[in-house]
């Protein structure tokens, strides 16, 4: 799937970086917000547009760790190191120097939200921070949705559609 560099999901990365500024104190440098609807439409916002662009162009959503049908997920936190498709985790690390991540997953009736937090390869101890501060991460998710509500509303008007995989 090819998106124009002007598509909001790619052009909003600077705005996303501003929204995650409070995370800088913890050296969290990577954040994504994905909202996957049961009808197959999706929102994908990220601080790293080059990663999202490559992910879509390579059609990695066909095997992605958060790209199965939204009904298959539970409300939970999941470390990148525990995800089923480690090939994508390694690709993110090797090609974009992003690792040591965690997903906060929130399920509702018509969609599932995925908030990912990550950092660079030189910060493996961040995983301890995640595990000991899940409440902080949950509060940041709420903060992001409130502070980014206008961005999310704009994204709602440009949702992508692609098939969910069944793995």
Residue ranges and their predicted role:
Residues 113-116:
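Short glycine-/small-residue motifs
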Residues 3-10, 18-96:
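Structured interaction and signal-relay segments at domain junctions
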Residues 87-111:
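Helix-to-coil/beta transition segments that act as allosteric "coupling" elements at the rims
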Residues 56-61, 69-71, 102-106, 127-130, ...:
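Glycine-rich loops and low-complexity Gly/Arg-rich segments
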Residues 35-39, 107-108, 118-121:
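Short, flexible beta-strand-to-coil junctions
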Residues 1-16, 120-167:
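Juxtadomain coupling helices with adjacent low-complexity linkers
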């Amino acid at each position: 799937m090819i998106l124009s560099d002007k598509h909001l999901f790619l052009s909003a990365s600077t705005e996303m970086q501003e929204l995650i500024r409070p995370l800088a104190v913890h050296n969290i440098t990577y954040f994504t917000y994905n909202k996957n609807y049961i009808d197959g439409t999706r929102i994908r916002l990220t601080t790293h547009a080059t990663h999202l662009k490559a992910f879509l162009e390579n059609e990695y959503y066909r095997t992605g760790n958060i790209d199965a049908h939204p009904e298959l997920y539970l409300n939970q936190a999941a470390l990148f190191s525990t995800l089923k498709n480690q090939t994508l985790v390694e690709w993110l690390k090797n090609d974009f120097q992003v690792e040591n991540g965690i997903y906060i997953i929130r399920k509702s009736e018509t969609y599932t939200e995925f908030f990912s937090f990550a950092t660079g390869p030189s910060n493996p101890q961040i995983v301890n921070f995640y595990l000991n501060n899940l409440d902080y991460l949950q509060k940041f998710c709420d903060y992001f949705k409130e502070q980014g509500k206008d961005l999310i509303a704009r994204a709602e008007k440009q949702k992508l559609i692609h098939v969910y995989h069944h793995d």
